[in-house]
């Protein structure tokens, strides 16, 4: 899928597996329910660090200073 730079409340194309790469500086990946009713989790990331994150298709990611790539879609 297409790379999304610095996502804010983004479901990353409804992907269920997302590759996140911190670009340039430390950041924090924040995962929330689609309606904003619940914080699912926060992951601090060092500059240059990357992770893969499993989520529900509708969950939303906010992650400044990052690139997020959808890599899987499971329904």
Short names for language-model regions:
Residues 1-75:
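Surface-exposed, low-hydrophobicity beta-strand/loop segments enriched in small/polar/acidic residues
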